[in-house]
From Swiss-Prot:
<keyword id="KW-0949">S-adenosyl-L-methionine</keyword>
<comment type="similarity">
    <text>Belongs to the UPF0677 family.</text>
</comment>
<keyword id="KW-0489">Methyltransferase</keyword>
<dbReference type="InterPro" id="IPR029063">
    <property type="entry name" value="SAM-dependent_MTases_sf"/>
</dbReference>
<dbReference type="GO" id="GO:0008168">
    <property type="term" value="F:methyltransferase activity"/>
</dbReference>
<dbReference type="InterPro" id="IPR007213">
    <property type="entry name" value="Ppm1/Ppm2/Tcmp"/>
</dbReference>
<feature type="binding site">
    <location>
        <position position="120"/>
    </location>
    <ligand>
        <name>S-adenosyl-L-methionine</name>
    </ligand>
</feature>
<feature type="binding site">
    <location>
        <begin position="149"/>
        <end position="150"/>
    </location>
    <ligand>
        <name>S-adenosyl-L-methionine</name>
    </ligand>
</feature>
<protein>
    <recommendedName>
        <fullName>Putative S-adenosyl-L-methionine-dependent methyltransferase RHA1_ro00605</fullName>
        <ecNumber>2.1.1.-</ecNumber>
    </recommendedName>
</protein>
<dbReference type="GO" id="GO:0032259">
    <property type="term" value="P:methylation"/>
</dbReference>
<dbReference type="Pfam" id="PF04072">
    <property type="entry name" value="LCM"/>
</dbReference>
<dbReference type="InterPro" id="IPR011610">
    <property type="entry name" value="SAM_mthyl_Trfase_ML2640-like"/>
</dbReference>
<keyword id="KW-0808">Transferase</keyword>
<comment type="function">
    <text>Exhibits S-adenosyl-L-methionine-dependent methyltransferase activity.</text>
</comment>
Length: 294
């Protein structure tokens, strides 16, 4: 269970979910119809040495149903394209909130002069930096790690790292919202808005919005023979308290918002999911992707 002020490294609590995401990105990368190319993801999983995830890399069939890694492929592609679109529109600074083991500063082709800020827990960023250094990786942008808890005063830490609120920004909120208490969730959007000059972009995924966590757990147990995250009960890491609806909040604060469901996104990427049970259709319809421009 989560507690106020809890922290983690890459093989515990929320940090372990980042390792899972890296695993699913690595599995997606080797698919013949891969939607992404993330050759860095495998490095992180192998360096961490967590048995469940290294086992999945060695034998993906242990995952059983591959829909979960396919979902991660679509999600990753969505955010890749978001950054490409935003920088193509002239945005020259990007902020990746809860960056985890995200390697976009290394694997995407950023325009010259782009600064990428990665915000996450200190131990997570330290692990990532060590692995990338061990492999001699070179970032394709001006990468600036910002070691801070998103429940704390992260805007101050971001500005201390050189963030300029007077310039348009591309913000990514990927795989994050469910792990925040309601108050921190709402404060996150307030702070993004306050730090965003006109012309800023934001992309958000909102997993299983409005779904009771006990129901989510029951659906997962019913349709997935193996827990994609091994022994960790991901639902226990989520907060299910009241929070603002991101679409309504952003729209009400002057952002122009576009929304799609995970099923719509999968179909757009040539990954339609046929014949899902009604419960999974409902869950997928509640898993949404947003882009917004200020």
């Amino acid at each position: 269970m989560r507690t106020d002020g809890d922290s983690w490294d890459i093989v515990s609590s929320v940090g372990l979910t980042a390792l899972g995401v890296a695993t699913f990105r690595a599995l997606e990368t080797v698919r013949p119809d891969a939607l992404i190319q993330d050759d860095y993801a495998r490095w992180f999983v192998e360096a961490a040495g967590e048995p469940h995830f290294t086992g999945l890399l060695a034998d993906p069939s242990l995952l059983g149903d591959m829909r979960f890694s396919g979902f991660m492929g679509s999600r990753t592609r969505f955010f890749d394209e978001f950054f490409s679109s935003a920088t193509g529109a002239g945005v020259s600074q990007a902020v990746i909130l809860a960056a985890g083991l995200d390697a976009r500063a290394y694997r995407l082709d950023w325009p010259t002069g782009t600064t990428v800020f990665e915000v996450d827990q200190p131990q997570v960023l330290e692990f990532k930096a060590e692995v990338l250094a061990d492999h001699g990786a070179t970032a394709k942008a001006d990468r600036r790690p910002v070691a801070v808890d998103l429940r704390d005063d992260w805007p101050a830490a971001l500005e201390a790292a050189g963030f300029d609120p007077g310039k348009p920004t591309a913000w990514s909120v990927e795989g994050l919202l469910a792990y925040l208490p309601g108050a921190a969730h709402d404060a996150l959007f307030e702070r993004i808005d306050e730090l965003s000059s006109p012309g800023s972009h934001v992309a958000v995924d909102n997993f299983a919005e409005g779904t009771d966590m006990q129901r989510f757990d029951a659906i997962r147990a019913k349709y997935f023979a193996e827990n994609p995250f091994g022994d960790i009960d991901i639902a226990e890491l989520f907060y299910g308290d009241e929070r603002a609806d991101p679409v309504q909040w952003l729209t009400g604060h002057g952002w122009s918002v576009r929304r799609s469901t995970s099923l719509e996104l999968a179909a757009a990427y040539g990954r339609p999911v046929p014949d899902l049970p009604e419960e999974l259709v409902d869950l997928s319809e509640r898993s949404t992707y947003l882009t917004a421009v200020k």
